[in-house]
């Protein structure tokens, strides 16, 4: 992308990168590192025409989270939205950041978590 002078990278993190959660130290810290990598790459590759951003999803209803059952709903209830996201809601944020409509967005970490990290 940098050789062509155009492109967009959208990393996918997690809301758990923004606050401590019991039992999530390794996962959360690795995703917090991804947030910093997003910003560092934005600084490094932005001048070469490549935008780098990240989406940090909250609880999301997927095949992978189906086994969580009611725990997913309880986790989501802690956010202002009060419900889990659909995979489409997360995908829409990724598509937006990858699109030309986000052409002036560099190094952003977008929480798509129903407001959990805000409240």
Predicted regions and their residues:
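A glycine/serine/threonine-rich, flexible loop-to-helix segment
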Residues: 47, 57-79, 89, 119
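Residue(s) in the substrate-gating loop at a strand-loop-helix junction
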Residues: 14
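Active-site helix of classical SDR
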Residues: 30, 38
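Active-site "substrate specificity/gating" loop of NAD(P)-dependent dehydrogenases
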Residues: 20-24, 29, 46
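Conserved SDR Rossmann-fold cofactor-binding beta-strand/turn motif
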Residues: 51-61, 98, 111-113
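Conserved catalytic-site region of short-chain dehydrogenase/reductase
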Residues: 17-19, 118
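Alpha-helical segment proximal to the catalytic Tyr-Lys
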Residues: 43-47, 103
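C-terminal substrate-recognition "lid" of short-chain dehydrogenase/reductases
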Residues: 6, 83-112, 117
């Amino acid at each position: 992308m940098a050789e062509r002078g155009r492109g967009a990278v959208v990393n996918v993190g997690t809301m758990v990168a923004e606050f401590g959660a019991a039992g999530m130290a390794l996962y959360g810290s690795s995703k917090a590192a991804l947030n910093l990598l997003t910003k560092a790459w934005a600084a490094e590759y932005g001048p070469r025409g490549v935008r780098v951003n990240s989406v940090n999803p909250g609880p999301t209803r997927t095949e992978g989270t189906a086994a969580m059952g009611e725990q997913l709903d309880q986790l989501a209830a802690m956010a202002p939205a009060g419900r889990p996201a659909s995979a489409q809601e997360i995908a829409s944020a990724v598509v937006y950041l990858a699109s030309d409509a986000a052409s002036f967005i560099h190094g952003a970490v977008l929480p798509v978590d129903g407001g959990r990290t805000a409240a």
